[in-house]
């Protein structure tokens, strides 16, 4: 928790200091009230006291009350500002750090867990700071100040109060020791519930199609019940705290008055003034003792929240302190243009026992088309994911424009690439916003938008929309078909006017006619652009300048369609499974 608080900005620190000053003032006025109460008690029990003097003391007490209330309001405002400002800063840092993470780090944490840490965990921190600035600071100051005030009044009464404080401290520590491990369990269960819910909602159509509602409900019910039972155990412990505190506070008040009565009885009946003074001290002592108890009650409220906040802080720090394996280089310019080269590249996924890719070497030049084909799981997507550095090669070098991709600045490398993912991803917003997504050196004009949509073969359905390119796309593109999503994803890559286009099985959702028109348009209008196409269809790749055939992570064939039909059995088998010998001739 302290490690996280060290990230607080100067503005938040200043507001926290001001809040502390206001708390000091508030405590001063609160603890001044019993002194006036002593004077008032003495006046009421002393013959000949003037009404004006009594009213004067009463007005001073009213002034202290109003001043304390005003300072409390100011402290509440500042604590809320501090907490919200700090949570905003941490949320920004956390989100930006997550955005810098590579695929490896994302897999280690999981998306539902990262969402929980960015939302729920930060809310826990915000609550503890807001409450803490008002209570954690106020409680010990008030308790210590009140103890100092009562120390010289009666050692017997002080001993009773001290005994109560010790008992409460032991009780609170026991509750915290029991509850903190359970809060960690609750946070992990929250991640699990988010994961199951996200999986269920994302695949809701599949769930309905396979009549799997009961199975999914049972799957969700297990972590949900575990969370309920764990939280109930904690709530039972917390339910004991306030009654115990109330019983203790009332018992302490009763003990003070009983002991005070005993002490008063021991004073001689003739010493009336001494009895009045002692009675006044008992009343004031009871008030101060109540302040001590109230301080501990406030601390108890914080301690009820603190374990969850502590776990949340650990989870946030875990993400912020996670090193990103993909480090940015310093090169901002390539030696060539439009070239991609793999030199003896091997790759192994983290924690895997075998290589996913083994000793891959090839080079394509500006304007050429490279196709990659192979069975499912042969490593096609893995191979092209090394170009934009979703992962880094375990061995060998991946070069773009003659420079190792590890040496490039991220902006420089990404500006050279137009990447179309295997699974089309669209974002909530208009078609125009999706096509011109991200930062690019390419102009964002209506003409460029039209060209990208035409070339991607998306014009057919975009022109039919009432709002055209201003038509709003829902989250993840749920209001357009798979083929439409794929074409808009391709338009997004084309709008960047990159040197190198990478298509990761991006034509799979297109019909054969649209596929052919798209490839024809790419060859005609983007003759100088290097194209890398991962595909399953022979018809999509047969006219490529170079085709790589992958099998279990190894390049078992490389050449043109005609060359591979002659000397690569794997390619020939794939080709004949899709087209007849006459069609392949």
Question: What label would you give each PLM region?
Answer:
Residues 14-36, 57, 61, 76-80, ...:
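Alpha-helical segments in transporter systems
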Residues 11, 15-28, 32, 130-186, ...:
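Transmembrane helices of ABC transporter permease
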Residues 335-585:
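ABC-type nucleotide-binding domain
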Residues 21-22, 29-42, 55, 64-111, ...:
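Juxtamembrane helix-loop junctions of ABC transporter transmembrane domains
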Residues 50, 149-163, 233-314, 319-320:
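Helix-loop-helix
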Residues 10, 100-104, 120-129, 133, ...:
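An intracellular "coupling" helix at the cytosolic face of ABC transporter transmembrane type-1 domains
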Residues 10, 14-74, 78, 151-156, ...:
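Transmembrane helix-loop-helix hairpins at lipid-water interfaces of multipass membrane proteins
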């Amino acid at each position: 928790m302290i490690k996280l608080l060290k990230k607080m900005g100067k503005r938040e620190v200043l507001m926290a200091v001001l809040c502390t000053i206001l708390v000091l003032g508030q405590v001063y006025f609160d603890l001044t009230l019993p002194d006036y109460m002593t004077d008032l008690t003495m006046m009421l029990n002393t013959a000949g006291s003037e009404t004006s003097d009594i009213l004067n003391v009463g007005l001073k007490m009213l002034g202290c009350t109003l001043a304390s209330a005003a300072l409390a309001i100011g402290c509440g405002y500042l604590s809320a500002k501090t907490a919200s400002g700090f949570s905003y800063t941490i949320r920004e840092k956390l989100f930006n750090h997550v955005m810098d993470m590579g695929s490896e780090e994302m897999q280690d944490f999981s998306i539902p867990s990262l969402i929980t840490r960015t939302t729920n965990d930060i809310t826990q921190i915000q609550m503890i700071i807001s409450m803490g600035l008002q209570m954690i600071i106020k409680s010990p100051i008030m308790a210590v100040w009140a103890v100092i005030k009562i120390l010289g009044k009666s050692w017997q009464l002080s001993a009773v109060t001290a005994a109560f404080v010790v008992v409460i401290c032991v009780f609170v520590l026991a509750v915290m020791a029991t509850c903190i491990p359970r809060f960690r369990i609750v946070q992990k269960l929250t991640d699990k519930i988010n994961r199951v819910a996200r999986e269920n909602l994302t695949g809701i159509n599949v769930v309905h199609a396979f009549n799997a509602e009961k199975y999914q409900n049972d799957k969700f019910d297990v972590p949900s019940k575990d969370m309920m039972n764990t939280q109930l155990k904690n709530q039972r412990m917390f339910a004991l705290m306030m009654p115990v505190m109330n019983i203790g506070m009332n018992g302490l008040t009763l003990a003070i008055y009983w002991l005070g009565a005993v002490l008063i009885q021991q004073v001689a009946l003739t010493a009336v003034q001494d009895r009045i003074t002692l009675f006044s001290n008992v009343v004031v002592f009871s008030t101060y003792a109540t302040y001590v108890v109230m301080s501990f009650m406030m601390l108890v409220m914080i301690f009820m929240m603190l374990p969850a906040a502590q776990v949340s802080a650990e989870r946030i720090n875990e993400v912020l302190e996670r090193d990103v394996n993909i480090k940015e280089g310093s090169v901002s310019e390539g030696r060539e243009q439009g070239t991609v080269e793999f030199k003896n590249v091997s790759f192994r996924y983290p924690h895997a026992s075998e290589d996913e890719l083994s000793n891959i070497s090839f080079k394509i030049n500006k304007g050429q088309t490279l196709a990659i084909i192979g069975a499912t799981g042969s490593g096609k997507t893995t191979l092209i994911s090394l170009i934009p550095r979703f992962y880094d090669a375990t061995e060998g070098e991946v070069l773009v424009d003659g420079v190792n991709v590890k040496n490039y600045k991220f902006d420089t490398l990404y500006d050279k690439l137009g990447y179309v993912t295997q699974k089309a991803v669209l974002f909530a917003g208009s078609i125009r916003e999706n096509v011109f997504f991200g930062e690019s050196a390419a102009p964002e004009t209506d003409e460029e938008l039209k060209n990208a949509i035409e070339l991607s073969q998306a014009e057919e359905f975009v022109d039919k929309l009432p709002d055209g390119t201003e038509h709003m796309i829902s989250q993840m593109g749920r209001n357009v078909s798979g083929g439409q999503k794929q074409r808009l994803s391709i338009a997004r890559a084309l709008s960047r006017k990159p040197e190198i286009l990478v298509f990761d099985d991006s034509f799979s959702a297109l019909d054969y006619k649209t596929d052919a028109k798209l490839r024809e348009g790419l060859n005609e209008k983007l003759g100088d652009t290097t194209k890398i196409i991962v595909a399953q269809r022979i018809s999509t790749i047969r006219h490529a300048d170079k085709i790589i055939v992958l099998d279990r992570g190894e390049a078992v064939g490389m050449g043109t369609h005609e060359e591979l039909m002659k000397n690569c059995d794997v390619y020939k088998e794939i080709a004949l499974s899709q087209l007849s010998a006459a069609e392949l001739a």
